[in-house]
């Protein structure tokens, strides 16, 4: 609903006091809503640097500013050594880093991550957790939807646990982990927050 893929049955969606319920995805992106899908979204026939530049071309920047931002993102995400590699040549980890760098090229206020921990190895999980921490440091709001509870609760300030289509509990990770109903219905009695 936040990015505009589905319409709400009721209620409204607001961003900074602006109603965006009926806005298409591209207008929401222009207002600062970034989205990273669970499925691979890297442009497979473009190089890593062209993937990033493709987004920068839509921003009101001159060429020098675009190149500076692209270089900064390549450096920040450790992509310099593969900058000329095509999207279809990247490992899963490199692809994910490229997708996140590309999403940041739009200069979002919020970024929505759909199942960022799905199907990735433990090193990639740590990598994504580090990246999310960096996003928070940049004052970018991060909304994560994921079934990997341990990985997600480790990096969130606040969480909403959905169970059978409704919010079972909202609160800090510690509050969720300590809640008797949450443990009984979703986490299990032996769940421990790391």
Where in the sequence are the language-model features?
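Conserved ABC ATPase "signature" region
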Residues: 18, 64-82, 129-133
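ABC ATPase NBD coupling module
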Residues: 19-39, 63-67, 83, 173-183
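Short coil-to-helix segment of the ABC ATPase nucleotide-binding domain corresponding to the Q-loop/switch region
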Residues: 46-53
């Amino acid at each position: 609903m936040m990015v505009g893929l589905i319409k709400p049955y009721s209620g409204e969606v607001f961003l900074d006091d602006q109603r965006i319920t009926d806005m298409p995805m591209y207008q929401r992106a222009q207002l600062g809503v970034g989205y990273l899908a669970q499925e691979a979204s890297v442009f497979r026939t473009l190089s890593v640097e062209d993937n990033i530049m493709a987004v920068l071309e839509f921003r009101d920047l001159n060429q020098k500013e675009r190149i500076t931002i692209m270089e900064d993102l390549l450096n920040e995400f450790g992509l310099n050594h593969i900058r000329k590699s095509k999207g279809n040549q990247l490992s899963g980890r490199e692809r994910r880093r490229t997708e996140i760098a590309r999403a940041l090229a739009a200069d979002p206020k919020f970024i929505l991550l759909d199942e960022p921990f799905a199907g990735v190895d433990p090193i990639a999980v740590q990598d994504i957790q580090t990246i999310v921490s960096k996003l928070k440091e940049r004052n970018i709001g991060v909304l994560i939807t994921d079934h990997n509870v341990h990985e997600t609760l480790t990096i969130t300030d606040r969480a909403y646990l959905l169970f059978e289509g409704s919010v079972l509990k909202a609160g800090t990770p510690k509050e969720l982990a300590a809640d008797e109903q949450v443990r009984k219905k979703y986490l299990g009695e032996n769940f421990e927050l790391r």
